[in-house]
Amino acid sequence: VQPIYRSRPGADAMAPASAEHAEEVATGIWCSPGLTNSYLLTTSDGRVVVNTGMGFEGPVHRAVFDAVDSSPVRYILITQGHYDHVGGLDTLRDADTKVVAQANWEYWRDDNERLLPYRASRSAFAFSGRLADGIAHIQQRFGKKLPAQSSAAADIVVEDRLSLTVGERRIELIATPGGETTDSMVIWLPDERVCLCSNTFGPIFGHIPNLVTIRGDRYRDALTVIDTIERVRALAPEVLLTGHFDPIRGADLIDAELTRLRDAVQYLHDETVAGMNAGKDVRTLMREIALPEELEVGQGYGKLAWDVRAIWENYSGWFHHSSTTELYPVGPEAVSADLVELAGADALTDRARAHLNDGRPLEAIHLAELVTATDDHSGARRVLKEAHEHLLADSVNFWETAWLTKQIERYT
């Protein structure tokens, strides 16, 4: 059986909310797609909303859900505290709405707020254009003044599990600490056997989870991720409603995909630990560790090599025992000018070009960056541009592609 990721859209298809109508994806469950899908659960005693999108997406979600059912919003359930889940809270909730989140929501929110400038600047390379286009489209529909980003909040918290009954609908909220955030949870509808997992397994299902993000975040523990995958698999859902794209249907398919994902993360973890105990350095393991064919998963959002490094550093920290200088605040760039003076900018650039011509773009980047650190050398800049283009040609990963594209612009 082919891995499911091969037949589903990739990260490039993720886009801000724009739907004219909500889509009924299961009986009484409606989806408004966006940077993270928002879902509406209808009941005989009011509505339940799952996730609210970004602040500027709120009017879209509200409008399409109101067209389905205009009864009061009894609850808003937040599956994780990322901005694209909580931003539309103020637009989606009514005066008496209760917001429900996992008990770690304040811990997660406080991280985001204290690091807001840092994280915003480090995410811009991947999202700024997409956000600007989405905002412009929504402004055409709802006017120039769109709602600001809402702050995370919760009236009810879920420690491990919490059951709600709204009208005829039974809802179970289950903490999943191995999701993308420490306040992750899934929504389980036991009567329908539907699990709203959103981005618990990452924004595009069937791809290796990010155990750390290159935009900057705390490490995510591989064993906790495995426990979370198994917790959802044990529910035996017949429908999985994720954060993006169409539902995944069929108990056997869902079980097979969650088993594949669990075993892939376990394999990466175990091989990394074995390599550490054998005395191998992290870059060697990043190069060597690959999944067996039967555990193939996508790398459109996370990457195997990045997860190997995340597992290593989550266990071992930042000191790799490769150089005394790791312990001190003087990096290799401190002697770039010395190397350029000794070897010559042109000679280093020529050698970088030779590496590139022989299919070694990373070695080319190392040498060319020595030159550009001290001199705006046009030849070195051309090497850097072409080396990044070489890497981009082989990239299937959202974050890697965005970074490489931005670097190509920088050196053009």
Residue ranges and their predicted role:
Residues V1-D12, P117-Y118, L131-D133, Q139, ...:
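Accessory terminal helices/loops
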Residues A19-V68, V186-L189, R193-N199:
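Conserved beta-strand hairpin/beta-sheet module of binuclear metal-dependent hydrolase folds
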Residues G88-T91, N104, R109-L116, S121, ...:
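Short acidic, glycine/serine/threonine-rich loops at helix termini
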